[in-house]
Each structure stands twice: as structure tokens, then as C-alpha cells.
Amino acid sequence: CIVKDREYKVNLKMNGMFSVYNVLAALTTALALGMDIEKSIKTLEEIGGVAGRFEVIVNKPAVIVDYAHTPDGLENVLKAARDITPSDGRLICLFGCGGDRDNTKRPIMGEIAGKLSDYSIITSDNPRTEDPVSIIEQIEVGMKRTDGKYKVIVDRREAIAYALDHAKKDDVIILAGKGQETYQIIGKEKHDFDERVVVYKHLNK
């Protein structure tokens, strides 16, 4: 970054352009508060990744957990993932949309996934009191506006297993929507569900 005609190099431990924008915003705030720029940069360089935010949990294939649950969030994470996807690998997006929440974003997110992923798996993400199949059908409306290839697997655990079983070593799998959450809300009940644990258990069967 350049501050008052002087160039500074910042080495981040975080991935994605959205992390760059966040760091630039933090530095701008630090400058406005009169803080030392070099000390601020050193502090930012020491910050590790945030749990559930572009969190790489395994490699070959890369499996990344991210909280992206809005159109903007999904677009940003898929663009960041595309940057690290090998030329002979596929970008696979597994996602759903929350129940009893804004339903207008569902087709929008379907369209984004269809355009930016090589393959999508549409599944459940805290359906709450809504019918998960109905939520998925609304997502499909947007997906069908694209040429994107996709599969519907309502049960999220089964969807993750399918993604892992069919991925090749150079593929990148994005598990979008839950991030750091350790539960799945079905009806009015919270069920234990940590995607990291689901992935580890499946790979170590």
C-alpha cells in the first residue's frame, strides 16, 4: 500500500481480495486516529485467519469453510477461491440458504454460484421451519439462468460426503454458509453439526 507517497509492503496470513480491502480499511482508520503506520502494519501481519472465514481445513483437494451466506459474500469467496484453483482443477461450491430469512436472495445466490463455479451442490443451511426442498427450488431458479452444472442433495452431511468422494486432488471445494457455526437448525431444534468434523470423519473412515 502507498501512504503519503511512501510504499509499504504488507504480508497477510489471510486469503482473498476481501481481506485486502478489510486491511486497507483498518489502516485508513489507524491513520485517521494518528497511529503509527509501521506498528499498525506489523500488528496486521501477525493476525491469523478467522475461524470460518476462508478457512482451509484440508488440502488435495482443498476444502475451504466460509460463512458466506449473502450474494455479495458468496461472490467474493468464489472469486477468491478461483484465484487459487489450479488450471486443471475445478471450483466446487456447496451451499444453501437459511430458512425463515430473506427469500429474495435465493435465486440470486443460485445464479452467482452457477456463473462462478464449475460445479455446485445445492443443499440445506438451517432450513428452520421452512421446507428445505422449497428453499432449494428457489435457489434453482437462479441456477437455471446459467450454464452451471449442479446437483441437489438435501441432507448437508450427505452433500459434503458426495463432494469429497467426487473431488479430484486439484479441485477446490467451498463449503459456504455455515462458517464457524457448529449446528444445523431444522424445525425449531438445533442439531450438532460442525462441517470441519464432518469432513475429517468422512476422510478418515
Task: Go through each PLM region and give its residues.
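C-terminal accessory "lid"/substrate-recognition subdomains
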Residues: F18-S19, G52
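Non-catalytic surface loops within mature trypsin-like serine protease
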Residues: V3, M14-G16, C97
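Short pre-catalytic strand/loop immediately N-terminal to key active-site residues, enriched for Gly-Thr
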Residues: K9-N15, P61-V65
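Acidic-glycine-rich active-site phosphate/pyrophosphate-binding loop
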Residues: C1-K9
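ATP-dependent carboxylate-amine ligase
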Residues: A25-G52, V56-K205
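Short alpha-helix boundary/capping segments
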Residues: N15-F18, H191
